[in-house]
Amino acid sequence: MENEEIPEFLSPKEEIVYWRELAKRLKQSYQEARDELIEFQEGSRELEAELETQLVQAEQRNRDLLSDNQRLKCEVESLKEKLEHQYAQSYKQVSLLEDELARARSIKDQLHKYVRELEQANDDLERAKRATIVSLEDFEQRLNQAIERNAFLESELDEKESLLVSVQRLKDEARDLRQELAVRERQTNGTRKSAPSSPTLDCDKTDSAVQASLSLPATPVGKVCDNSFTPPKGIPNGFGTTPLTPSARISALNIVGDLLRKVGALESKLAACRNFAKDQASRKSYTPVGLNSSGGGSSALNSSGVKYSHAGHTSFFDKGAVNGYDPPGVLGSRPPSPPGMLPLSV
């Protein structure tokens, strides 16, 4: 309206009318603008109140979110610490399990090697048994020639006495070792329930050898043997002071078996000679009565000699079977070891 051109008036009345109408229009526009301003102010006040309310709510929500954020940060930190702790524990447990697995594999390999050695030892024992059977058969064939060697048997009788001295000493030491082994087994009974039980075969073998020596009749010690066998100081079952190798254990058992077989052979020879002497004395009709009575004593000695010979001919393998040791492949399958035994030193 400011740029509106003022028209040219022909008369003052037209000019008055024009300006009156212009004043009315301006007044009307002013009134409308004022109403709009009032309405706008009311709307702005309402909007401002609403915005204030929304601002308060937003600030409250923001404070809540900040507190939640802080709480969640604390929880995240605690969870991170727990996760790190759990990860450390898991890593440690995995390391322990890997170490146990490595030890178990090592023990498994050692047990496989030990089983192979036992199988080889069983094969050696079987061959020794067959060789012993062959030698016994050969000895039966040459038994008739042994009658002419009575003088030599007297010297072998002295050797028998020295061997019996060694056997008696072995029996005493075996009894002491068995008592010590029983004490140590009772002491270690609590720690013997988690490991495999197959390596107890050495203990069974040693026990069978000791039982074989204990099955002989006790003979009083009359002489001292210069070249007697000196047994080991500890049983090689993992509880002694110095565990022996499998070859040393097998050699010790072979020595004990040879001693037992040698004693049995000597006793059988002595019994055969006494039986022959008794038969020769009974065939002579002019033999005095005193000799007959002494022949009765000789028969008693022969009967005792036969008993000794039977005990001597009970081989190491038979005694092992009686005492609970049954070599695989010779007398059948080996019975399972007790589940509470610890593995022996390999």
Curated annotation (Swiss-Prot):
Provide a Gene Ontology MF annotation, just one: microtubule binding
Provide the record's note on post-translational modification: Phosphorylated in mitosis.
Instruction: Supply the InterPro entries for this chain.
Output: NUDE (IPR033494), NUDE_dom (IPR006964)
From start to end residue, where is composition biased (Pro residues)?
335-346
Just give the chief location class: cytoplasm
Q: Where is the signal peptide?
A: none
Name the UniProt key words of this record, in alphabetical order.
Coiled coil, Cytoplasm, Cytoskeleton, Microtubule, Phosphoprotein, Transport
- Top-rank taxon of the source lineage equals Eukaryota
* Record-stated family: Belongs to the nudE family.
Q: What is this protein called?
A: Nuclear distribution protein nudE-like 1
